[in-house]
Structures are given as structure tokens and as C-alpha cells.
Amino acid sequence: MAKPAKRVAVTGAAGQIAYSLLFRIANGDLLGKDQPVILQLLDLPQAQGAVKGVVMELDDCAFPLLSGVVITDDPKVAFKDADVALLVGARPRSKGMERKDLLSANAEIFTVQGKALNEVASRDVKVLVVGNPANTNAYIAMKSAPDLPKKNFTAMLRLDHNRALSQLAAKSGKPVASIEKLAVWGNHSPTMYPDFRVATAEGQDLTKLINDEEWNRNTFIPTVGKRGAAIIEARGLSSAASAANAAIDHVRDWVLGTNGKWVTMGIPSDGSYGIPEDIIYGVPVTCENGEYKRVEGLEIDAFSREKMDGTLQELLEERDGVQHLLG
């Protein structure tokens, strides 16, 4: 018996990240190889032609799991009964634009989208914000959707997590899949803190395998933090395929579970680890039965505290910068 189709809404559907994302969703990479999907694609009125072109390509792939496609410029149509919402579209920073202008431009977008989700999405909708500043955009959407559970709103730190995994695998000479118990704390920005103090590779303690605190502080942390900028420098374009891949990883794990493995998600803080409530902050989690659960009881040393508080400070400033726009 075929499963009923799940509705997956994707914003910024004409953009580069979406172009790397939509074909994989239609192929079953997001929700499983036995789960039909209906794609509900949102973009601006002037982008509708480009979205239609992408949908022509989706049609031409003849994906067995793709049960239907909706193209719209209306958030209430895009989010209608959505089971998953991938908020990819955001206002990019243009030349000479102040950060506060970027925050307020995005506050407008994510307030509208949060309200639409609140009105029409499934009450169990899983929302992932990819568009930057992702944590604060997720916070704005969450605040604009008071009737939905706060836990439904998450921000993407999986790209930072995957970038950190790759750097650790290269440094330790161990396969990337063997690395466990990595955490990334805080904001999806250069201030986030990748933390491998308790991580293992093939069951061995990674800090002993690498044994280089100077590398950790002066190479590893800045490399992960500035990787996006390095890709723009090299490619002339921002990381789109790796961001799409991280979005797939994030939602697939949330829906289908991590089998006890740690992953990183930006989630509403509950006050643990000295991070105040009412903020979306990256923490290590495990997922099962469609729910995430933060990893508890980790020791926080002085260096980690400093890094975690630094990224928290940035998040609090961003939150304060949009508070007046939230009514």
C-alpha cells in the first residue's frame, strides 16, 4: 500500500540552493525512498518563470515519488497543509548594506512566512530555516506563529557540522563516517563554535588522535567559521550544493532518526548550558520518532564557555535588532 504523499514547501524555489535541493527531495532523499511527496514552491512574482523552468526539469526526470507540484508567489498557498517547510529564500546582503538593514529586510519576509505557516500549515510542520541570518530568521518565524509549537522551528547548523566533520577526518586520517559526538554551538555565522572535545573516531578519542590544541584554536575553528567566505572567494558564488545537502541531512535525520548519533540543529533554547530561553541556538541533538532531543550533561570548560558566550552575544544582538519589528 503506497503511503499518502507528504507536502514539502520550499521557498526561494528559483534560487541556487533550491536547484540543488528539489531534485533530491523528489528522488526520496529527504523523507525516504518509499514516501511520495508534493512539492509546494514559493518565490517572488518576478521569479515565477524561472520556477516553471525548474518544474519542467523536475517533470523531465519522471521521479516515481513526485506526486505533484504547486508553483506560487503566495505563502498561504505554498504552506497549505505543509508537513515540512524549507525556508531557503532570504534577502542577501547587497553591497554597502548595513547588518541592521539586512536584519530588518529579512524580518519582514520571515514575519509574513511565520504568519502564513501559523494559519495554514500542518500543526506538526517541521520548519527548517536555511536563509541567513538563519537563527534569527527562524526566531522571527517562530515568534510570528504563536499557534504552532516552538519546537517545530529550527535553523540550519548542519552545514557547519558537516564542514567540521570533514576537517576532522582530514586531520585525523579517519573516515568521515567514523566520527561521532561532534557538537557545533551557537549561531550559523563565523562565531559558531565547533567542539570535538568528546568526539571519537572508530571509537578512539579524537583529541588524543589529533593532540594539537593550537590547530584546534587557530586553524580548525576559524576554517569552519569562514568556510562559506572561502568558497565564495574560490568559486565566485556562495555554497549552494553543500547547503542543500546539509538541509537534506537535517530534515531526514529529524524525520527518520539518527540511531543515537549526534547531529547539530539550531533549536529553541530551554535554558540549559547557560543559554537563555527565547533564542534559537545550535546544540548537539539526537533524533528519534520524528523528535529531536538535546544532548545533556556535557561539561563546559572555560574556553568552551568563552566561545559559547561569544556566539550567544551575537545572537542576542541580532534578536534585539529585530525585536521592535515583531510587534
UniProtKB/Swiss-Prot annotation:
Pfam family, one: Ldh_1_N
Residue sites binding substrate per the record: R93, R99, N132, R163
Record key words, sorted: NAD, Oxidoreductase, Tricarboxylic acid cycle
InterPro entries associated with the record: L-lactate/malate_DH, Lactate/malate_DH_C, Lactate/malate_DH_N, Lactate_DH/Glyco_Ohase_4_C, Malate_DH_type2, NAD(P)-bd_dom_sf
Listed CDD domains: MDH_chloroplast-like
Signal peptide stretch: none
SUPFAM superfamilies: LDH C-terminal domain-like (SSF56327), NAD(P)-binding Rossmann-fold domains (SSF51735)
Record keyword Ubl conjugation present: no
Reaction catalysis annotation: (S)-malate + NAD(+) = oxaloacetate + NADH + H(+)
Annotated catalytic residues: H188
Entry's EC annotation: 1.1.1.37
Top-level lineage group: Bacteria
GO biological process, one term: tricarboxylic acid cycle
General function of this protein: Catalyzes the reversible oxidation of malate to oxaloacetate.
Protein family (similarity comment): Belongs to the LDH/MDH superfamily. MDH type 2 family.
NCBIfam families for this protein: MalateDH-SF1, PRK05442.1
Protein name: Malate dehydrogenase
